From Swiss-Prot:
NCBIfam families: PRK00132.1 (NF001099)
Organism: Xylella fastidiosa (strain M12)
Keyword RNA-binding carried by entry: no
Ribosomal protein found in the keyword field: yes
Biological process according to GO: translation
Keyword annotations of the record: Ribonucleoprotein, Ribosomal protein
Protein name: Small ribosomal subunit protein uS9
Signal peptide: none
Example of a GO MF term: RNA binding
Organism phylogeny: Bacteria, Pseudomonadati, Pseudomonadota, Gammaproteobacteria, Lysobacterales
Family in the record: Belongs to the universal ribosomal protein uS9 family.
């Protein structure tokens, strides 16, 4: 019997996450490590679990995740979007609920580039009247 799995891709800032959803008991592994070991911060773990908690599927799936690029927050956001997309692939009736909660929307905010003649993207040198 082939393993049936659902797939979802998520991106946030410079992070990308590939999410594979399989029927199981609620094990979540990111890059071969358990979720609690991969993310040190509790907030990041909460972000990842949000779509599962909303749809009451916390212990119904085993999730395999490959996350690359960016930092902790970016990867957590990318994983959340990937899980939401994989859940919709599994059951399309979950889409309105996930969309209403904002989990189906790609956060388009990116880092603004540094401009020539400025310290940072917008930070200029202190203005001197005289």
């Amino acid at each position: 019997m082939p393993i049936t799995q659902n797939y979802g891709t998520g991106r946030r800032k410079s992070s990308t996450a590939r999410v594979f959803l399989r029927k199981g008991s609620g094990n979540i592994s990111v890059n071969g490590r358990p979720l609690d070991e991969f993310f040190g911060r509790e907030t990041a773990r909460m972000i990842v679990r949000q779509p599962l908690e909303l749809t009451k599927n916390v212990s119904n799936f085993d999730i395999l995740i490959t996350a690359t690029g960016g930092g902790t927050t970016g990867q957590a956001g990318a994983i959340r979007l990937g899980i939401a997309r994989a859940l919709v692939e599994y059951d399309t009736s979950l889409k309105p609920e996930l969309r209403k909660a904002g989990f189906m929307t790609r956060d388009a905010r990116e880092v603004e580039r540094k401009k020539v003649g400025l310290h940072k993207a917008r930070r200029a040198t202190q203005f001197s009247k005289r």
